């Protein structure tokens, strides 16, 4: 099973105006939430461990995961659902988040550990859940607990600079995790923000490789494709062509989910360190195709297994 932790929220997307008032559509979201949904649609076992609110937004979040074949392993709680105000220009989203006192932050280490059953092969974490507060510390501690039980760990920082009140502390946390995890994916924007002392992308990549111990390290570059690390070199893979771009919401999450699905289906999770370059390129092709199909639909709407055959 792929176990997923991290935020769930409602994306509030302005769809028009009425009587001088903005009209918004509420769409389920959150980077790890999107990843769980994307993986569940691709025919592997997925469990989502983050609490979900009992409010109407939470009902929609829960129903959306269940319809995508994701098991809800976290509790339903009375606190409200987190919100993200989304502005989309030329298909590219920007966000403002409201997460104080919300359901997805009410994690406890004891309840998380209860989900580390023999079914779990890999745990994925990332994005807002690691930004600040006691919940960020709990997630970091849970990574250690998972690794102690032989569970592989995957990280996608998916950095949101506007939400990070203490950048230095956040960078330290992410870099600590980078030294531990088995699978790491980050975007070129994540890379330059996290390694802000580097003068360019190449020096940032060198600094990254100097601290990671992951067997799978991927850098995504949007329409330029992606890079993967293999025996002391970076290798390029092109982006998969997008038929007609709707927007890029959830593209990175779909890509990361597809990486984990491919590794799971091809029984590579136990042999990450010896995967050959050709297989790694096949992995990137599969993930890029899934992300491309998501970009052809409005919002995060990842492809189903039959669409990727």
Residue ranges and their predicted role:
Residues 1-68:
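Glycine-rich phosphate/adenosyl-contacting loop at the front of the ribokinase-like
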Residues 3, 144, 198-309:
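Conserved phosphate-binding/catalytic region of the ribokinase-like
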Residues 37, 83-87, 225-229:
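Short beta-strand scaffold segments in enzyme catalytic cores
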Residues 39, 187, 252:
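Short, conserved phosphate/pyrophosphate- and ester-handling motifs at nucleotide-, phospho-/glycolipid
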Residues 45-127:
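Conserved N-terminal subdomain of the carbohydrate kinase-like
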Residues 119-120, 181, 214:
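Short, well-ordered alpha-helix to beta-strand connector turns
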Residues 128-207, 224-225:
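Conserved beta-alpha-beta core of the PfkB/ribokinase-like small-molecule kinase fold
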């Amino acid at each position: 099973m792929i176990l997923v932790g991290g935020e769930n929220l409602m994306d509030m997307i302005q769809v028009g105006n009425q009587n001088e008032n903005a009209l918004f559509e509420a769409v389920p979201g959150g980077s790890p939430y999107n990843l769980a949904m994307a993986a569940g649609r691709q025919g592997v076992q997925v469990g989502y461990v983050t609490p979900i609110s009992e409010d109407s937004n939470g009902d929609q979040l829960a129903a959306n995961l269940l319809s995508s074949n994701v098991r809800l392993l976290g509790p339903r709680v009375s606190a409200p659902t987190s919100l993200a105000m989304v502005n989309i220009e030329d298909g590219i989203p920007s966000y403002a988040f409201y997460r104080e006192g919300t359901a997805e932050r009410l994690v406890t280490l004891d309840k998380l550990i209860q989900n580390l059953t023999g079914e779990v092969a890999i745990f994925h974490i990332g994005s807002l859940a690691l930004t600040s507060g006691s919940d960020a510390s709990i997630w970091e501690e849970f990574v250690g607990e998972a690794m102690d039980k032989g569970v592989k760990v995957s990280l996608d920082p998916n950095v949101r600079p506007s939400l990070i009140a203490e950048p230095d502390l956040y960078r330290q946390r992410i870099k600590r995790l980078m030294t531990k995890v088995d699978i790491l994916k980050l975007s070129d924007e994540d890379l330059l923000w996290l390694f802000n002392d580097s003068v360019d992308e190449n020096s940032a990549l060198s600094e990254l490789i100097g601290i990671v111990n992951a067997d799978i390290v991927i850098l995504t570059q949007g329409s330029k494709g992606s890079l993967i690390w293999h025996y002391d070199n970076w290798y390029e893979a092109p982006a998969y062509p997008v038929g007609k771009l709707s927007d890029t919401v959830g593209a990175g999450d779909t890509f990361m989910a597809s990486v984990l699905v491919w590794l799971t289906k091809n029984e590579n999770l136990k042999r990450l360190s010896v995967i050959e370059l050709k297989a790694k390129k096949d992995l990137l092709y599969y993930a890029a195709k899934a992300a491309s199909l998501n970009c052809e639909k409005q919002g995060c709407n990842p492809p189903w297994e039959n669409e990727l055959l």
